[in-house]
């Protein structure tokens, strides 16, 4: 029957106009066309110019009211590939196993987002249409918008185009048997080629339960990336290769999750026991009460960051709608959280994080006995008819809208530059939006100059000073809602400090004090070396990491890899003195400082003079760029990986230099061939032939 469908689809494509949604979005200047599906929602995303709101609403209303399902069989092949991709994503296997263990009576656990292979082998376009008729109705959907528009005008426009949609009075309500309490650990195992790890999960009430505010605070007390119990007791103390934990909130049920990766020679059960010890501290109240206030301050800062962008503001509306929450409750959340006490946290942990009421998933290395690739049916490429178009598309293309005048960055007016001292140029831009600052020191040197730089930065994060231990540094930075990050690229290194502007001076003092006065610890260094070797071995088990390494080899060659990567013997030979000297040496080099925050130029200059401790006479650093290898012959570079699908890339470098005059043509060419869903490569590879999940 599929062969017959394929044949008819090909014949029909000769006379049919292809899917035009991507062309419509391009016509109105939209970006970021996307959609995603999770267990509780399907979300369609667009980033549109504010002068195209009317056209956008017209298109979307027609799309949801009168869908025409084109390219069904080629798009089905794409879903096959997505399913095959998931078979080699061990993290996805762990998630699905955890949901099955925690929610055996609820669709969270009884089915997956992608469905089973049998589901995908037996699709029904009739069922797709019935699903749309049932659920794509106004009493089951929301339009969540954020941006440059008048609210009343936006509401009127949405009413104009969506107002005649008919509700479904018989909209099905999800019926499920309430889950029974877990009284003894539920144990499951999954297998895959990637590195071993373990995850534990506890079932929680749904998003609208009053305890949800506490669950998020508890998640950050346990792990926040800086000063949580797992951060300080496990990661900082190097007791595991890595560990984390958090609360995952969903409408019907939520979950509290902790996970970890073992060090060399460490068993998954040992990691499990360490994680359980940290969770037990929540029940026993064995944590600093200051973590609650610090968590709330950091949550406020995260909200400020999310309010900087339209997409993150809109997604807050999405989550509120899906969970069925009142927006007023969302707005009042920080006020509620500020009233939570340590006893509230302890009581909550004893109620929901019992010592036996969890599920555990062991992700072990090995061949997955349940893995079965979906055999892709043979597809005859359909005719795309790119030159044919509907009257609707023509109408949108010829519609007249009020032009938006582009605003181009003027680097002389929109930002400023000044010299903090000879050898340190500052690029300054004032933050007019909120009270968050970002301060970055940028050095024109990297792993191509010294392959040990990243190890040096990593080592520094585990150390303390004469005045503060490493744990005290992490806790203090979290208390003041600030953080720092150090990284070395091939030719450039950076030290970044960010957080609440009122605490910038204190944060600079802590970070600069660590750089200047870190106390070496050989035991930490030896542990770190062992963890790096383990991480390298784990990376070789990951398909995308292997492909990334293959790309670097293809682009830059083996010499570049050798220059930028420490060999195992070279890694083992490094001493604390050598590593700390590398970081201290950076403060004797010329560099740039990038500042974005609410402080005035004079205040930034004063802060740098007071806290940024550098040599009086800074040595210059020559700016270098990694050299791409010329493509002088056809060749194939292959890295074998036992997966059900491949990562594929073609690359060519003719050695041409950048020409600013040619840049518009290059941009146009890239957009035409690979810039989106209506481009030549995507349409030929996915829509016409069903050969790839994504292509560009």
Predicted regions located by residue number:
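M16 family metallopeptidases and their MPP-like homologs
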Residues: 1-62, 93-118, 140-146, 195-206, ...
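A common structural junction motif
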Residues: 62-69, 162-169, 276-287, 513-522, ...
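Short, conserved secondary-structure transition motifs
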Residues: 80-88, 177-189, 295-306, 497-501, ...
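Short, charged, amphipathic alpha-helices and their helix-cap/turn boundaries
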Residues: 120-124, 571-575
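Proteolytic maturation boundary segments
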Residues: 150-190, 197, 231-232, 304, ...
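Zinc-dependent metallopeptidase catalytic helix centered on the HExxH motif
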Residues: 212-213, 664
């Amino acid at each position: 029957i599929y062969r017959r469908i394929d044949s008819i689809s090909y014949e029909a494509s000769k006379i049919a106009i292809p899917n035009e949604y991507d062309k419509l979005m391009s016509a109105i200047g939209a970006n970021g066309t996307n959609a995603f599906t999770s267990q509780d929602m399907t979300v369609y995303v667009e980033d549109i110019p504010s002068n195209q709101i009317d056209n956008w609403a017209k298109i979307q209303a027609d799309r949801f009211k009168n869908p025409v399902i084109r390219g069904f069989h080629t798009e089905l092949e794409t879903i096959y590939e997505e399913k095959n991709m998931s078979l080699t994503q061990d993290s996805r296997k762990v998630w699905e196993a955890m949901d099955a263990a925690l929610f055996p009576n609820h669709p969270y656990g009884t089915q997956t987002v992608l469905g089973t292979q049998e589901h995908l082998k037996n699709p029904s376009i009739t069922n797709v249409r019935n699903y749309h008729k049932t659920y794509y109705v106004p009493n089951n959907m929301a339009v969540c918008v954020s941006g440059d528009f008048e609210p009343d005008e936006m509401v009127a426009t949405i009413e104009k185009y969506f107002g005649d949609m008919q509700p479904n009075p018989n909209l099905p309500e999800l019926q499920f048997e309430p889950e029974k309490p877990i009284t003894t650990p539920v144990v499951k195992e999954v297998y895959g080629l990637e590195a071993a790890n373990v995850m534990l999960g506890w079932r929680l009430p749904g998003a609208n339960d009053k305890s949800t505010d506490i669950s998020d605070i508890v998640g950050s007390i346990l792990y926040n990336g800086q000063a949580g119990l797992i951060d300080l007791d496990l990661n900082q103390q190097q007791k595991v290769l890595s560990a984390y934990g958090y609360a995952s909130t969903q409408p019907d049920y939520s979950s509290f999750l902790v996970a970890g990766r073992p060090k060399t020679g460490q068993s998954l059960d040992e990691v499990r026991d360490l994680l359980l010890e940290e969770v037990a501290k929540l029940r026993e109240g064995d944590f600093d009460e200051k973590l609650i206030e610090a968590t709330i301050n950091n949550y406020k800062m995260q909200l400020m960051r999310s309010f900087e962008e339209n997409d993150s503001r809109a997604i807050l509306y999405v989550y509120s709608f899906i969970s069925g929450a009142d927006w007023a409750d969302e707005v009042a959340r920080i006020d509620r959280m500020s009233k939570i006490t340590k006893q509230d946290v302890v009581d909550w942990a004893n109620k929901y994080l019992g010592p036996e009421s969890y599920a555990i998933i062991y992700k072990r290395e090995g061949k997955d006995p349940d893995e079965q690739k979906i055999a892709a049916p043979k597809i005859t490429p359909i005719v795309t008819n790119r030159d044919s178009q509907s009257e609707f598309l023509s109408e949108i293309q010829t519609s007249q809208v009020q032009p938006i005048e582009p605003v181009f960055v003027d680097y002389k007016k929109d930002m400023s530059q000044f010299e903090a001292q000879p050898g340190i140029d500052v690029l300054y831009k004032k933050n007019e939006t909120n009270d968050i600052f970002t301060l970055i020191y940028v050095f024109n040197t990297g792993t191509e100059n010294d392959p040990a730089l990243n190890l040096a930065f990593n080592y520094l994060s585990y150390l303390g000073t004469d005045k503060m231990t490493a744990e005290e540094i992490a806790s203090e930075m979290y208390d003041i809602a600030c953080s720092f990050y150090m990284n070395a690229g091939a030719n450039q290194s950076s030290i970044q400090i960010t957080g609440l502007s009122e605490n910038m001076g204190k944060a600079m003092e802590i970070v600069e004090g660590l750089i200047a006065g870190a106390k070496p610890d050989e035991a930490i260094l030896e542990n770190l070396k062992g963890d790096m070797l383990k991480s390298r071995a784990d990376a070789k088990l990951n398909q995308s990491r292997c492909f990334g390494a293959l790309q670097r080899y293809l682009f830059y060659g083996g010499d570049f890899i050798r220059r930028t990567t420490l060999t195992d013997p070279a890694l083992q030979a490094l001493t604390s003195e050598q590593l700390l000297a590398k970081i201290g040496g950076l403060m004797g080099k010329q560099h740039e400082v990038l500042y974005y925050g609410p402080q005035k130029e004079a205040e930034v200059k004063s802060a740098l003079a007071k806290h940024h401790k550098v040599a009086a006479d800074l040595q210059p650093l020559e700016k270098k760029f990694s050299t791409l290898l010329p493509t002088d012959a056809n060749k194939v570079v292959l890295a074998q990986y036992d997966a059900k699908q491949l990562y594929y890339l073609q690359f060519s470098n003719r050695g041409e230099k950048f020409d600013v005059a040619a840049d518009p043509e290059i941009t146009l060419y890239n957009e035409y061939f690979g810039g989106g869903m209506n481009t030549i490569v995507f349409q030929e590879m996915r829509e016409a032939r069903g050969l790839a999940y994504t292509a560009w």
